[in-house]
Amino acid sequence: MKVRASVKPRCEYCRVIKRKGVLRVICSRQPKHKQRQG
C-alpha cells in the first residue's frame, strides 16, 4: 500500500473508492497498485 498526496488509477483495473472519508485505489489485477491518500 502506497500512501500518496494524489491517488490516480494506474491501469484499467484500478478503481478509486472512498472508505471512511479516505480515498483509496484498489486493483484486482495488480495488488501493487494499491494506494491511499494521506
UniProtKB/Swiss-Prot annotation:
| Keyword Ribosomal protein in annotation | yes
Among Pfam families, the record links this protein to: Ribosomal_L36
Q: Which UniProt keywords apply?
A: Ribonucleoprotein, Ribosomal protein
Q: Which domain of life is it from?
A: Bacteria
* InterPro entries in alphabetical order: Ribosomal_bL36 (IPR000473), Ribosomal_bL36_sp (IPR035977)
List the GO terms this entry assigns under cellular component, sorted alphabetically: cytoplasm; ribonucleoprotein complex; ribosome
Annotated GO MF terms: structural constituent of ribosome
Similarity comment = Belongs to the bacterial ribosomal protein bL36 family.
**Protein name, as recorded:** Large ribosomal subunit protein bL36
> What organism, scientifically named, is this protein from?
Roseiflexus sp. (strain RS-1)
